[in-house]
Curated annotation (Swiss-Prot):
Residues 1-31 form a transit peptide. Its main location: mitochondrion. It is found in: Mitochondrion. NCBIfam families: PPR. Belongs to the PPR family. P subfamily. It comes from the Eukaryota. This is Pentatricopeptide repeat-containing protein At5g15280, mitochondrial.
Amino acid sequence: MLNLLSISSSSRLRFLNKVSSLTYHYSFAFFSTSSPASSSSSSLGNDSAIPRNYESSSFNLLSRSKEKRDLTGSSLKDLLFDLSDVVPNITRRFRRFPGLKPEDVLELSLGFESELQRGGIGNIKVQALWEIFRWASVQYQGFKHLPQACEIMASMLIREGMVKEVELLLMEMERHGDTMVNEGIFCDLIGKYVDDFDSRKAVMLFDWMRRKGLVPLTSCYQILIDQLVRVHRTESAYRICLDWVETRAELNHMNIDSIGKVIELLCLDQKVQEARVLARKLVALGCILNSSIYSKITIGYNEKQDFEDLLSFIGEVKYEPDVFVGNRILHSLCRRFGSERAYVYMEELEHLGFKQDEVTFGILIGWCCYEGDIKRAVLYLSEIMSKGYKPDVYSYNAILSGLFRKGLWQHTHCILDEMKENGMMLSLSTFKIMVTGYCKARQFEEAKRIVNKMFGYGLIEASKVEDPLSEAFSLVGFDPLAVRLKRDNDSTFSKAEFFDDLGNGLYLHTDLDAYEQRVNMVLDRSVLPEFNSLIVRASEDGDLQTALRLLDEMARWGQKLSRRSFAVLMRSLCASRAHLRVSISLLEKWPKLAYQLDGETLNFLVQEYCKKGFSRHSKLIFHKMVQMHHPIDNVTYTSLIRCFCKKETLNDLLNVWGAAQNDNWLPDLNDCGDLWNCLVRKGLVEEVVQLFERVFISYPLSQSEACRIFVEKLTVLGFSCIAHSVVKRLEGEGCIVEQEVYNHLIKGLCTEKKDSAAFAILDEMLDKKHIPSLGSCLMLIPRLCRANKAGTAFNLAEQIDSSYVHYALIKGLSLAGKMLDAENQLRIMLSNGLSSYNKIYNVMFQGYCKGNNWMKVEEVLGLMVRKNIICSVKSYREYVRKMCLEPQSLSAISLKEFLLLGESNPGGVIIYNMLIFYMFRAKNHLEVNKVLLEMQGRGVLPDETTFNFLVHGYSSSADYSSSLRYLSAMISKGMKPNNRSLRAVTSSLCDNGDVKKALDLWQVMESKGWNLGSSVVQTKIVETLISKGEIPKAEDFLTRVTRNGMMAPNYDNIIKKLSDRGNLDIAVHLLNTMLKNQSIPGSSSYDSVINGLLRYNQLDKAMDFHTEMVELGLSPSISTWSGLVHKFCEACQVLESERLIKSMVGLGESPSQEMFKTVIDRFRVEKNTVKASEMMEMMQKCGYEVDFETHWSLISNMSSSKEKKTTTAGEGFLSRLLSGNGFTWKR
């Protein structure tokens, strides 16, 4: 195990989530060129990524710290703090402990596991628990975790994908001589190794388990075997599969499909005996194997050329081979021993149940023709006909080729006639054989006739029929100019090779040896169908339907796909979106061929799968390439990163990112924009900056373009400050930044409402005599006006000649309330002959409304009516708000009529909603009824916003019945009320004493799954129940809502009330709930709980809460401090009281005089005068006077006990005691 776990993973995913739940720590340097540190993997899912926080005020772009916490010097309190919002009820008790016992760690682990099962706890918290686990291991020599704690910890680590940490835990256990006996944990760890494509570690861990006598689960066997088959690890797959069959001797614990894959893999590697052993064991267990497994073993024997054992196997298992298997065997026999012996073997197969078809005889025909035995080939053809089969075109082609090869071309017409009689269409391959054969026989007239016939069938173009002989030569594969048919004019015909019908002596003017070699080669290749070459040709031509059809035919003809054909076919299939899934199925069907693909093809497959979004398959091939050390192209890395940003988890993305960095990956500049966009959306801003640095350095001639693209992407996605920091750094290094970059920064910063930064960039541009673009100016000018920088806005507007700039100025001045300037600007605009926009009237209308200039409002409104300019919704909202507050609601209603003329129904609802809202705000709810009647008359249906306004408005107007009625109507329509509406109705019901209806309402919300985490509503219901004395009902209600996840953010008031009434259990439960919800309770909550515990003399629990309270930064009240001090004194634990007072002083608090006196009196009772005197000194330093009786009593105790203690040299106890300036004599 130690050897296994010490193996460093080849590509370890780094751990990103070392972040506290309350604070984030950042620490990476700007433009750091170091690659991200690898650490343990974490499962973060295809969740929506939350971009990391970055500060823009510094040149240092900061990221989360990826370093693990150094446990040296870490206190238990620090470590427990990270878990205080997960299991506060447990961590609270351990805060005051100097260390942890094994039982404590187990309790903490059990509590954490329980919370983890409820969900909502991520990797960060598991890492925090792991750090406590590690801290406990080293707190003192000899500490040993309990086995159950180790199991729980390992299980949680595996669940979060923290594999490295699990390995460390197991190594630690083995050092202590312990062994984990939970098979499930090891199986889960093997599963993680498989997920990370680390089959080596998975197999080693499996072997270790078996040596320890542990039996993996069925699912573990299955996933491990499937992975080993995928990576073609035959020996390991067989060994584990055999162990599975022998160990799990029950069929319901085995997956026959997985075992079948192993058998196929064994047969592919010619390990047929091992495959047969597996099959026998399955049969011995009573398993009825399907024919596919027997087929695989049979083909394995065939590949091994062990035909005797093949027959023996078939006879033993009584397997009847199908035509695919039988034809495969027959094809191999023909190639190895010839067609005659193959036929004899076929007859033996027939006796064992094999049923041949026309292709079976076609294989025999082809090989007979290849061997030159045309007679037997024709006999086989006759046998096909006699059995009622229809001969295949390849069989006829074989016979035609055989006849031509033997010089029997005169008999070919009989074959052609038979083909026609059987209704077989002559194909291009048949015509090509005929042309080639006639060219071989020097029957060129016949060859011309065939070419003309091909034209009749539409197989060649008309232009090629003009010279049919040249076309015939082209079909054979000759260059027509290199082969000429010439007449021998010599009277002796010395050159004549043959004669035409007219008796002319003719000869071929060409290289006769090459001619004969070519025609013979074509005829030889036509004897047996060469499916591999046909598939390659169809794939390269893009005819994938034909290629796939040939692939199916190939299997029937018993031929195997070659590596080259597979590679070409896969590339073509991947390039076609319609056939992409076919390529995936072929990869799974032929794992051995997939394993043998070359690096270039694998790179191509990854790129195409990524383009089509098949990230899982691209990831599988990528890991295979890494394991086989294939070179990975830059384009492949780019495709993977882009695809994983969209489809895979953050860890998968970072894994590829790390590998790309190690390979010095550099994307093409054209891909950078898309990459930066994807990475930023995934939250990897640090990686974006790193990539930009590399691109910027690597493309010196395109640095301006790279900077522009980088800044554009970051500003669009909301990271303008990061982009600005990068640009400032580049400027500091002497780089020249284009003006367009500044424009992108300005737009981004304005969009992010960081106006001051945008103004700073504007100043920089103006200093450099640069003028912002029109788009930048339109965003800057209104903001400058609102920021009281109208002068700069005017100066900027003068630089741009556009009517849009005038609108921007008017808008900015209007929104800033500078209406006189806006009017002057409008006059200038009109005097320059520029037409005004409808928007200008709307913004001025809004400006006059804000300034309460009603005369101007009416003037602009009249102008808008005359010009038929529709008032915008925003303008109407400003107007109706002012009118309803005046109150002049009739004016608002009148304007609404004008506005509705240009609005669709949804717009009408918005307008009515605004009118209802502001009428309620103006306490004019009677007019609301009229508005509702009007809406009903016009057929305008109220939406969710309307109902919410009505519910809250009527409630605020004390019309509770109407409020409840509209709430009920809203719920009945399936609309979810907002918190404000629910709060208003619940409060009114509770105030009127009808808490039952409030509870019923809450149950309705709960039944619909509406999570309304309103603390006010819950508090109101609970407080009402408590005031009515119905404490059990209040507790049941709170327990139910917290259990169902409907937590309110704050329960402080309820906690205080329950604690005061002595219901501490539910009060503590609510306090814990708040902490789990990452909401820190108020000091009053802790004070009330502590005081309640003190009333029941539960001092230890009270101190637990007190310690937690202080560590959370809360200040206990004086009464809480005092109560603890008094209770500890009463319990004869005065040293604890003393410690509390000192702690209080250390925190800057002032203990009361009564607290000091209580502690001093207790020390006096215990005759501990030294401590008493120390308390008196502290009391005096806090400004309190010690009375004479206390002093004298202490002196008397000192004298009677003869306790003498020298303090400072030459100073007695009495003088030291009475030297405080706070002492006064009684008069």
